[in-house]
Regions:
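Subset of outer-membrane beta-barrel
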Residues: 2-260
Length: 260
């Protein structure tokens, strides 16, 4: 059986910036930190909204959409996020309320409460479950950022099958900035159901507001990704393509708007 990266009550990194770096993003501090590592929200300086779309396997029924709204208040930011995957007969939704706070110039902490809802057509019905997340970011030395994130700290169980727990996912990564022009990211991710996955990504700023990205990840199947981003006035648009050895290319697009 081929896994395509989604399952009920699962957690999945969001944003085309993350996708273009093979999701090596646990150390990033953009608005997508609301889904990837809530500690990164503590570095948000303006109210922002973001939308994301992924067309997996070029099949509408496997597409994923997400939206985030975040507001900073001094050294704290509050965000709400929503993710949807599936189609009318089967779909998954994730609602999240996140808080990220800088505890000092070089450290931040974030938490999130999630509600997962799964819909089955016919006699199978619906079910929901609550989960918790926690994340940490720190800068032990100049230009080096360390990120750690734990999904399902509550060890919640799946209501559709009480003998099964919602997967616990641990992520740890490093990001190193080179002369404010390039960032190298490395990350390891351990899902309680699977072997550890290792990821690496590169983001390069060749000129102005243009960013080029690439990344690779290991796992049961080798994958690689590439993408680009461009900022114009209050908007940032990111596009990425990830490649699965067997299933082919998946396009990703996201847009961020600075509100006030």
């Amino acid at each position: 059986m081929i896994e395509i990266g989604y399952s009920g009550d699962d957690n999945y990194p969001l944003g085309a910036r993350s996708a273009g770096m093979a999701t090596a993003s646990v150390m990033m501090t953009d608005i997508w930190a609301s889904a990837n590592n809530q500690a990164g929200l503590g570095y948000l300086e303006q109210a922002e909204a973001a939308l994301y779309y992924e067309n997996r396997l070029n099949t509408k029924s496997l597409s994923q959409q997400a939206g985030i709204f975040a507001v900073p208040v001094k050294s704290t930011a509050i965000a709400i996020n929503y993710r949807y995957f599936g189609f009318s007969k089967y779909n998954e939704s994730k609602f999240g309320l996140a808080v990220g706070k800088k505890l000092g110039e070089k450290i931040a902490l974030g938490v999130q409460m999630d509600y997962f809802h799964t819909h089955f057509a016919g006699d199978y019905g619906n079910y929901g479950v609550l989960c918790g997340e926690i994340g940490l970011l720190c800068e032990p030395v100049k230009n080096l950022t360390v990120g750690a994130h734990l999904f399902n700290i509550s060890r919640s169980k799946q209501k559709a099958n009480p003998d099964e727990r919602v997967p616990t996912v641990m992520r740890f990564g490093l990001g190193y900035s080179i002369r404010d022009q390039a960032t190298i990211s490395v990350e390891t991710e351990k899902d309680s159901r699977m072997d550890a996955v290792f990821k690496g990504g590169l983001e390069y700023n060749p000129i102005g507001e243009l960013f080029l990205r690439c990344g690779v990840s290991t796992g049961h199947l080798y994958q690689y990704a590439f993408g680009l981003g461009y900022s114009w006035k209050s908007f940032t648009i990111d596009v990425a393509f990830s490649h699965h050895q067997i299933l082919g290319y998946n396009p990703h697009i996201s847009i961020i708007a600075k509100l006030w």
